[in-house]
Amino acid sequence: MSMFLDTAKVSVKAGRGGDGMVAFRREKYVANGGPWGGDGGRGGDVIFVVNEGLRTLMDFRYNRHFKAKAGEKGMTKGMHGRGAENLYVSVPQGTTVRDAQTGKVIADLVKNGQEFIVAHGGRGGRGNIRFATPRNPAPEISENGEPGEERELALELKILADVGLVGFPSVGKSTLLSVITAAKPKIGAYHFTTIVPNLGMVRTKSGDSFAVADLPGLIEGASQGVGLGTQFLRHIERTRVILHVIDMSASEGRDPYEDYLAINKELETYNLRLLERPQIIVANKMDMPQAAENLEQFKEKLDANYGEFDDKPQIFPISGIAHQGLDALLDATAQLLAQTDDFLLYDESDMQEEAYYGFEEEEKAFDISRADDAAWVLSGEKLEKLFVMTNMERDEAIMKFSRQLRGMGVDQALRERGAKDGDIVRIGKFEFEFVD
C-alpha cells in the first residue's frame, strides 16, 4: 500500500547567547570592589512540536526560515542577562526530520504534543565576575555569547489524502484536481486515464489546507476486482471526506443519477464503513448543454429517496474547466473536514518499525590549510566557536585564547607544517603573527 510523500526544506537558526560583561564594583565605603560583570542570557532554541490539527507541510512552502532570538547581554552588579524565549514551530503528526546535507534522520515526530529541539541556542558568555582568581582578583576579561546552532532541514510527511475524488471514469476528476491544486495529473478523454492516485494540496482563500486525491476511475464490479478494483477502493478507504464527482452533461450517454447510485453501491459492497464518510456531490461540467436540466432532474430523484428529516448530501454545481463554483466547494469541504473525525489511517501492513544506527567519527578540533597568499588558515567547529566567543577588544581575552590554542595543540601542529616566526595565521577575517 503506497502512501503519498509531502516534502519541504527549511532553515533553522537558534539564538545566539548574550555577551558577558566587564564591570567593576565602585561604591562608596567599598574598598577594592572587584569584578561585577554578569553573564549573558542563553539564546532561544528552535523546537518542533507536533500539532495533530495540521495535515500537510504546505505552510513551510511560504515560510522556510525560522530564527530564534538572542539572549540579552550580561549586566552590572553581577546580574545575568535574560534568556531568550524558545521558538516553537508546529509540524504535522508523522513528520520525519532529516539533515538536508547528510540525509540523516534527526527525529520522527509521531505523537501529538511531542517536542524536539532541532537547533540549540548558544549559551551566554561569562562576565568578568566569573574569571576572578586569587592571582587575578580584577580580571578585564569576558566572553562573547556562543552562536546558536544553524542547519538546513528536510521535512517529510507520509500522508494519506483527507479528501478523495470518486466517480466514473472521465467525469472530470483530474481536471478538477489540476485547477484546485498545483498537481499535474495526466488528463485525457478516455477511461482510466488515472491509473494511480494523484495527490494535490489545496489552500482555500480563508487559509485552510488539506490533501486531495484524484483516485482511479471506478466502474461497476470494482468491489469484485473489475477494472482497477480493490486497489482503488483501498485508497478511498482511508479518506475522511468524499467528493462524488458527477458528469451533469451526461456526455457519455449515462444518467447522472444512475452513476451516483452505481458508485455508492460499489463503496457499500466493498466496505460498509465507506458510506460513513460524509459526501459532497460535485455536479461537474455545468457549462455544457443540458447540464442545468439534468441537475434539476438529479435533485428531484435525490429528494425522492430521502426523508424530510434525513441529512441529504450537499450539491455544488461547478465547471472544473471553466473554474466556476470552486471557492464555495472548497470552503464547504474544509468545514466538513473540521467536523469529521479520523477514520482508519494505517493497517498492520503499513506499520514499519525503523531503527537508525550510525557511527560518527569524532570531529577534528581544528584543520590547517595554506591560503594563496601563504597565510596559514585555521578552521574547525570547535576552534571557530572558541574564537567567536573571545572578546578580541580585551588583551586578557586574547591572551586566554592564545593559551587555549596552545592547549589544543595548534602551535605544535603549525610548527610541524613548517610555520616560521612571523608567518601570518588567519581565523576567519582575524589575522595574527605566529610566534615561535
UniProtKB/Swiss-Prot annotation:
The molecule here is called GTPase Obg
Task: Enumerate the subcellular locations listed in this protein's record, separating them with semicolons.
Answer: Cytoplasm
List the source organism.
Streptococcus mutans serotype c (strain ATCC 700610 / UA159)
**EC number(s) per UniProt?**
3.6.5.-
Q: What quaternary arrangement does the UniProt entry report?
A: Monomer.
Q: Which residues bind GTP?
A: 167-174, 192-196, 214-217, 284-287, 319-321
Q: Which UniProt keywords apply?
A: Cytoplasm, GTP-binding, Hydrolase, Magnesium, Metal-binding, Nucleotide-binding
Q: Which GO terms describe its molecular function?
A: GTP binding; GTPase activity; magnesium ion binding
NCBIfam families the UniProt entry points to: Obg_CgtA, Obg_CgtA_exten, PRK12296.1, PRK12297.1, PRK12299.1, small_GTP
Signal sequence segment:
none
What does this gene product do? An essential GTPase which binds GTP, GDP and possibly (p)ppGpp with moderate affinity, with high nucleotide exchange rates and a fairly low GTP hydrolysis rate. Plays a role in control of the cell cycle, stress response, ribosome biogenesis and in those bacteria that undergo differentiation, in morphogenesis control.
Give the binding site residues for Mg(2+). S174, T194
Pfam annotation, one family: MMR_HSR1
